[in-house]
Amino acid sequence: MVDLKTKAFDFAKNFAIALDGPAASGKGTIGLILAKKFSLQYFQSSIVYRQLAFDCINQKIDVTDMDAVIALSKALKLDSHLDLEHESIGDMASQIAVISEVRNNLNKYLINLVKTTPRIIMEGRDIGTVVVPEADLKIFITANPQIRAERRYKQLQAKGKKCILDEILRQIILRDKRDKERKAAPLLPASDALIIDTSELSAMEVVEEVTNYIKNKIA
């Protein structure tokens, strides 16, 4: 873990947190709690990729038709009423995310959002390394694949959605491989990120660690 004791925070002014990590590592739960605790607007960057995946499926555009996918990414419009959590959408979003032109187009949307939002926590895969490298605080959340699959399985079951644990684990391992090996912004922590392995930690324990870290910086 990188020692960031030399970096001081002025939390009273504009503040941006970049929260990165692999699929189902607990970023969303942790991000929402931190956003509420520190009065930050929370935004999940994967929504733009899932929206694009949904649009491709809806318009019967195959992920291999790169020109069509890229064109669609230039005119993306978010629909907050859609349920974009289905695993098939997440899997296609992961395939779309390896297209560098798509990432460039969607990153423009994300960068503009950060610039126009004074206090924000943005969650994703490359927020601290690409989208907001100047973020006041960068956090990288990770956990082993089996635990992440079990967490996702419980989340989906709680929402009444049918799912198979082994299939979720298979997709998580596949997404990890895509995320880490893609040429455009591979998944990795920023050099100055606070790295937390949540395999044996609850969401509240992680929030407490981050909270103490922030308090030490603004003390």
UniProtKB/Swiss-Prot annotation:
EC category name: transferase
Primary location class: cytoplasm
GO biological process entries: pyrimidine nucleotide metabolic process
Any one GO molecular-function label of the UniProt entry: dCMP kinase activity
Listed Gene3D superfamilies: P-loop containing nucleotide triphosphate hydrolases (3.40.50.300)
UniProt-annotated binding residues for ATP: G21, P22, A23, A24, S25, G26, K27, G28, T29
Record-listed E.C. numbers: 2.7.4.25
Localization per Swiss-Prot or TrEMBL: Cytoplasm
Pfam family, one: Cytidylate_kin
Substrates-to-products reaction catalysed: CMP + ATP = CDP + ADP; dCMP + ATP = dCDP + ADP
This protein's UniProt keywords: ATP-binding, Cytoplasm, Kinase, Nucleotide-binding, Transferase
InterPro entries membership: Cytidylate_kin, Cytidylate_kinase_dom, P-loop_NTPase
Superkingdom to which the source organism belongs: Bacteria
GO cellular component: cytoplasm
Family per record: Belongs to the cytidylate kinase family. Type 1 subfamily.
Protein name: Cytidylate kinase
Organism: Rickettsia akari (strain Hartford)
Native organism taxonomy: Bacteria, Pseudomonadati, Pseudomonadota, Alphaproteobacteria, Rickettsiales
